[in-house]
UniProtKB/Swiss-Prot annotation:
InterPro entries: Casein_kin_II_reg-sub_N, Casein_kinase_II_beta-like, Casein_kinase_II_reg-sub
PTM remark: Phosphorylated by alpha subunit.
Family of the protein in this entry: Belongs to the casein kinase 2 subunit beta family.
Protein's name according to its UniProt entry: Casein kinase II subunit beta'
Keywords in alphabetical order: Phosphoprotein, Wnt signaling pathway
Entry's Gene Ontology cellular component terms: cytoplasm; protein kinase CK2 complex
Modified residues (Phosphothreonine): 2
SUPFAM superfamilies in UniProt: Casein kinase II beta subunit
């Protein structure tokens, strides 16, 4: 990586605390207008935001939006570009490196034995849901452990990323977890109907009128 790469907005953004799930999108990818089709309708100040991402001179400062507003637009635009980029071969390679290093975290399920996870969105529309983590071992999704990731929009990773990832990198996919938790009481397995039966008994006791409850016999 060159000094110019390290001083770029993209590098700076990805190094911010809470942005560890992002990879650095190649500038060549962003410069190809075909890759940005229809994103202008989703981002305010689209042109200025794109110039921020690419470290271009935005022109007259008097015409620019207020800095916090522009920065928010740049971050949103980068996130939407990122969701597309990580479906490409180059993007998958970068995310594979992070996956192998465990940078996305591990599955909280005990029987998955700290299986590395991938980020996933529950919606492709920005603003609808936050990022989740997907475990390929138990095939389930969870809320990220670190609270700093709770503000990441799930649309910046997309609903299809893990599935494309493992289609391109099948060797990285672990075997599905077979071990399941079995509830026991005093060492015996609890029958699936036990809780329902107990609830029905409790309900019957609760609904029985006081006068109908048998009183103890007297000699």
């Amino acid at each position: 990586m060159t000094d110019s790469d390290e001083s770029s907005w993209i590098h700076w953004f990805c190094k911010q605390r809470g942005n560890e799930f992002f990879c650095e999108v190649d500038e060549e990818y962003i410069q190809d207008k075909f890759n940005l089709n229809f994103l202008d309708s989703n981002v305010k100040n689209y042109k200025c935001a794109l110039e921020v991402i690419l470290d271009l001179n935005p022109g007259s400062a008097s015409e620019d939006p207020a800095e916090p507003e522009l920065e928010a637009s740049a971050e949103k635009l980068y996130g939407l570009i990122h969701a597309r980029f990580i479906l490409t071969n180059r993007g998958i390679e970068l995310m594979l490196d992070k996956y192998n290093k465990g940078e996305f975290g591990t599955c909280p399920r005990a029987f998955c034995h700290s299986q590395p996870v991938l980020p996933i969105g529950l919606s492709d529309n920005p603003g609808e849901d936050m990022v989740r983590i997907y475990c390929p071992k138990c095939n389930d999704v969870y809320i990220p452990k670190a609270s700093r990731h709770s503000n990441l929009d799930g649309a910046f990773f997309g609903t299809g990323f893990p599935h494309m990832f493992f289609m391109e990198k099948p060797d990285a996919r672990p075997k599905r977890a077979k071990q399941k938790f079995v509830p026991r009481l005093y060492g015996f397995k609890i029958h699936p109907t036990a809780y329902r039966t107990a609830a029905e008994i409790q309900k019957d006791v609760t609904m029985t009128p006081v006068g109908e409850i048998d009183s103890p016999s007297h000699i």
